[in-house]
Amino acid sequence: MLSADDKKIIAQLWEKVAGHQDEFGNEALQRMFVTYPQTKTYFPHFDVHPGSEQVRSHGKKVAAALGNAVKSLDNISQALSELSNLHAYNLRVDPANFKLLSQCFQVVLAVHLGKDYTPEMHAAFDKFLSAVAAVLAEKYR
């Protein structure tokens, strides 16, 4: 559960991300494919090489979904309901992969924001990404 302080910090962090979210989404996916190569199995039709337009496009979608969740911090489940259905029923992605991508997104934020990515931001955004992963996995039950 996100506290009022967490929500405030997450909103402030996303303001810092604004204008870079597509780049960050792309980089997070690239990091995931390199660090966890088994995740490539869910993208058999993608060219997963660095600079791939398909990965760049999907990174934009990831960032847009996170942005949508940030705008709906009081009801992330409703904001991501369609995405949850897609991943559970159509794509059948192992929900463990959501946590892997979350870790990679955290690394991207730390690399790009440096000292501006405070421990408080890290903790709040980690809770947020955990909530997003839980919502995306809730239809699997």
From Swiss-Prot:
Ranges of residues in domain Globin: 1-141
Purpose of the protein: Involved in oxygen transport from the lung to the various peripheral tissues.
PROSITE patterns reported in the protein's UniProt record: GLOBIN (PS01033)
A GO CC term attached to the entry: hemoglobin complex
Protein name: Hemoglobin subunit alpha-D
Tissue specificity as recorded in UniProt: Red blood cells.
This protein's record includes keyword Transport: yes
Binding site for heme b: H58, H87
Subunit structure of this chain's protein: Heterotetramer of two alpha-D chains and two beta chains.
Record-stated family: Belongs to the globin family.
Keywords: Heme, Iron, Metal-binding, Oxygen transport, Transport
SUPFAM superfamilies to which the protein is assigned, alphabetical: Globin-like
Record-linked InterPro entries: Globin, Globin-like_sf, Globin/Proto, Hemoglobin_a-typ, Hemoglobin_oxygen_transport, Hemoglobin_zeta
BP term (GO), one: hydrogen peroxide catabolic process
UniProt-listed Pfam families: Globin
